[in-house]
Amino acid sequence: LVEKRPDYKIIANFLLHRIVPLQKYVMPVNPFDDHKDSKSSVTGIKNALLHLSEGYPLGIFPAGEVSTFKDGRLVVDKPWEEGAIKVIRKAQVPVVPIYFHAKNSQLFYFLSKIGDTLRTAKLPSELFSQKDRVIKVRIGKPISVNEQNEYKTIEDYSEFLRKKTYMLANSFNKENKLLTVPNLKPQKSPKKI
């Protein structure tokens, strides 16, 4: 993505911002900051909105953290952060949903059970452990501002964006039937008489 759009940035954990090759692509936020109105949060939101208003692309992970195991099962995401959804809505730009089909190491999920701090500290090494792995990504169609504005409450808007994103996961769970049909030929146009 950054080969095509070197101006692309993501809002991500400040620990990822400390990795030198990633610095120019990460707008850092502090997930441990309990005060949503703190200076670091306000600065991050202002920078994100400025970046978007200048026509540059921005990636946001609305859950604010990586999916983890709970009760032995992979959890999709925790509820998406209201603050992230408000930033997306306030930007008034088309939204492109993206679904990542990937897993982290068993150690990462084990540390998640112990605590958020350990899980977060493991993030940089998890990122580098993906180096030779194939990560499946599905990119959806842009959602227009008009379509977004049909959802009046933040809750409805968040649910709409979440559904649009997780609908992209279905392609990884089903085989494409069209590709398995033998001798599929395009229909001929009817002859004019």
Label each region the model flagged.
Residues 1-38:
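Catalytic core of membrane glycerolipid acyltransferases/transacylases, capturing the structured
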Residues 42-193:
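Non-catalytic C-terminal accessory region of glycerolipid acyltransferases
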